[in-house]
Design a protein with these regions (language model features):
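Sequence signature of WD/YWTD-type beta-propeller architectures
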Residues: 1-228
Length: 228
């Protein structure tokens, strides 16, 4: 396992090749979340990253909250966390760590807006649904066959479908989805900014880079960038 790393309020990360990090001011080292990460394998031999989360209180005592999470997001209060463990989404409080609350089962990944009013759930089949705060049921399926998604700070969820050499990039706001571009190689979210890469012409390894501050209107910023 790695050394303990600080995870402040609204810190979010997911293991694997796609990793999104949203780190805000963590404040004191006490009354804060920390995590370790380590490599794991599923029954088919696929390698991925898992996380153990701890809360260090003002008395300098470390309490383990979660073991074996594949994705987590620290809630704005900095004392509770949303996490995916064994394909289910839980919320765990530092003040009651032995009683995690099940939010939803059959969850591969999730994205939540800053106030956790809207939580987008992707199941193990790649279907995306919305769980609104206080709602007893999930929305209907918004998008299908999604392989990767990431949330922007403005509450826009970006998604890409299953692909080999290029997929369809879409955005979701509420229960409405919008196709942004086709044949997209990959995309990343950096908090307030998103970028995606699209193959440039017939040459291998060269991509045009498009960027956006709202997750819907993208502008070509770099042509024929070499990505190794």
């Amino acid at each position: 396992a790695s050394a303990l790393s600080l995870a402040g309020a609204q810190y979010s990360t997911m293991g694997g090749s796609e990793c999104t990090v949203l780190l805000k001011n963590a404040g004191s080292l006490f009354n804060s979340m920390f995590y370790t990460e380590y490599n794991a394998k599923d029954s088919d031999g696929n390698q991925f990253v898992e996380y153990d989360l701890y809360f260090v209180n003002s008395s300098k005592k470390a309490v383990k909250l979660v073991g074996g999470a594949t994705q987590f997001t620290v809630q704005p209060d900095g004392t509770s966390v949303y996490c995916v463990v064994d394909s289910s989404l839980y919320t765990v409080s530092a003040f009651n760590p032995k009683k995690p609350e099940l939010v939803e089962s059959n969850v591969y990944a999730f994205g939540a807006d800053e106030g956790f009013k809207n939580v987008y759930l992707t199941d193990i089949y790649g279907n995306v649904r919305l769980k609104k705060d206080g709602a007893s049921k999930l929305s209907d399926i918004i998008l299908m066959n999604i392989s990767h998604s990431a949330m922007m700070n403005n509450g826009t969820l970006l998604c890409i479908g299953l692909y080999d050499n290029g997929g369809t990039l879409c955005s979701i706001k509420g229960t409405e989805s919008k196709i942004l571009d086709e044949n997209v190689y990959y995309f990343e979210v950096y908090g307030d900014v998103a970028a995606y890469y699209k193959k440039a012409g017939s040459k291998d390894g060269l991509y045009d880079v498009y960027m956006s501050e709202d997750g819907e209107n993208f502008t070509l910023c770099v042509e024929q960038a070499a990505i190794g």
